[in-house]
């Protein structure tokens, strides 16, 4: 079988072009540097959207003011191919110059009061304002984005990447009309009151329309589509801006792509887990039938400090995980090599890519083999947060148990084939079809591990009379919660139980988990010891640290 170029091992370097550097850019020299010094085999360059990097004929497609008549897109594509590089064209229709807003205000995102949403304001220097565009508006659709993609695809580009692709909260007339048609009600002022699927419906619909235009013209050119591994940093953003459901990616993209930035400028306490880039790559392998995901790693320390780069060993560690977990690597630099303020990163990118180049044959056609499936349910995470999911990852990694992710939408006999055990980390929303597949899996001897609210609701969020897998686990749901269990414990009732192997001589395990009460046919190995004090009073004095209720029998 012939491997398409985007399924082979990739060493992508993105040059995030700054418009002021346009006169300094010699495409042939830049491509030589990327190929010979940084050992890239594919490049990402700006093409259109916020700025046109070629002589566009599309009305309201804002030209790069430093272009001075050049066709930088054409020059760059030709230079890339001369040096044996694949060329991925980057576009961004998420925002546009204020001069366009003044001509076509209906294309832009609005507050409930009808005001536009400025992006990146204030920005020092001689810059005009940028306004967020409406996902459902003409700028992101047939009036600008579609004809711009047609222009870009007239060049011999090898791939397409839409930066900033997301749903933007908007109360414009078009969004109000579509919402009314979809749900028979008015669009609420409060985004928290939007229907659950509104952001996703808007985002996916927009992406599918653009993909149809591109695929009709150049079916050989892959579209890179975003997915995310939810974490605490991204969860609130994804709730309001569309989940980018991995299961929907196949309807508008050919290659899964993610961006697990190591954001040092957020501070140590807000830093992402050390395994985040690797697990992002691993999730990507589950998205589009095993197509290797492309994982974007920013060389900078965060958007606040685009012109300083990550420490060498920090960056190498973040990169290494991507490759180790089956992903293709994409480095992002701010500017071309000759305009780098922090040039230390160039040696790191070059040496790391050279290592991958030497071992390219070993990295080709890899498969992820693991006995354990961890179910990823984006809808459940949206409802309950990512804590159970992230905690499951942490536990399996710490115990060095190999696992693969399985999308909730792939909970079928075929999807479960090859696994010995399936872990459901609070997969609250579970369809009847998925439940039946899990029951058959268990009947064949497969192991099931489920936590908290797994199976409490159907796939639409309707609460079930009993949790979907209650019969398999031998429990009945009492239907109410014990929350705020800080300063509580789990009492060890059966130290010989397999779940507690190696726990040692202790009666208590620390606990602060919310509890969904159940009753069961079998004795629980752990039961609740309720809090001995409120969180405010737990620390002092030690003379009052005794536990008033030693045993409840609550599992």
List each model region and its residues.
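Active-site-adjacent "subsite" loops/lids of carbohydrate-active enzymes
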Residues: 3, 8, 22, 89, ...
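Catalytic domains of carbohydrate-active enzymes, especially glycoside hydrolases
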Residues: 26-52, 154-157, 249-256, 318-325, ...
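An active-site-proximal structural segment forming one wall of the substrate-binding cleft
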Residues: 33, 37, 79, 131-167, ...
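Aromatic-lined carbohydrate-binding/catalytic grooves of carbohydrate-active enzymes
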Residues: 34-72, 95-117, 121, 169-184, ...
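Short, acidic/polar
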Residues: 20-37, 139-153, 235-249, 311-319, ...
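Conserved beta-strand positions
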Residues: 14-15, 40, 45, 162, ...
